[in-house]
A protein has these predicted regions:
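Short acidic, glycine/proline-enriched helix-loop-strand junctions
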Residues: 14-16, 30-31, 81-86
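Histidine/acidic residue-rich metal-binding segments in metalloenzymes
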Residues: 45-149
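Short beta-strands and strand-loop turn motifs
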Residues: 1-6, 32-36, 59-63, 110-113
Length: 149
């Protein structure tokens, strides 16, 4: 079984896209579980039609590797998912801290001359997500890359 992030073509942000994924994967040896887009087009602004997507078979909601930057957006999303027994999968990353970094900040990134992403960018974003998740009695699965926490 595979859970599929919504960053597909087309983006899994509407019932038609989920139906298309289910149709295309019907005869495969692996069962696909769609993680629908948390926001329209995975753009981080407007919440997708979560109830319709859940009814169409979405097992969770995420914008994939795109972190939700707007606290109000993810707060509303947690509120919705808490009422429909679903969860949010978010990659924590405060872009005001990670900016244009391309790898984890470390002695190695400095040695190679690569702009590093401080682990703090994930920690601050994760803390926000955990607080909003608890506030809404919701569920969160966070995928991280720094190993900082």
């Amino acid at each position: 079984a595979l859970a599929v992030f919504p960053n597909t073509n087309p983006v899994l942000d509407n019932k038609g896209a989920l139906d298309s994924l289910k149709f295309r994967s019907a005869d495969k040896m692996v069962e696909f579980f769609p993680i629908a887009s948390l926001t329209v087009g995975t753009e981080g602004m407007d919440i997708s039609e979560m109830a319709d997507l859940k009814e169409a078979g979405a097992v969770a909601f995420s914008d994939g590797k795109k972190s939700i930057q707007h606290a109000g957006v993810i707060k509303r999303a947690f509120r919705y998912t808490s009422t429909m027994d679903s969860m949010i999968v978010n990659h924590p990353n405060d872009k005001t801290l990670s900016e244009t970094g391309i790898m984890n900040e470390s002695a190695e990134s400095a040695f190679m001359g690569m702009k590093g992403i401080p682990g703090l960018a994930e920690e601050i974003s994760l803390h926000r997500d955990l607080q909003l998740c608890e506030y809404n009695d919701a569920k969160l699965l966070s995928h991280m890359g720094s190993g900082y926490i």
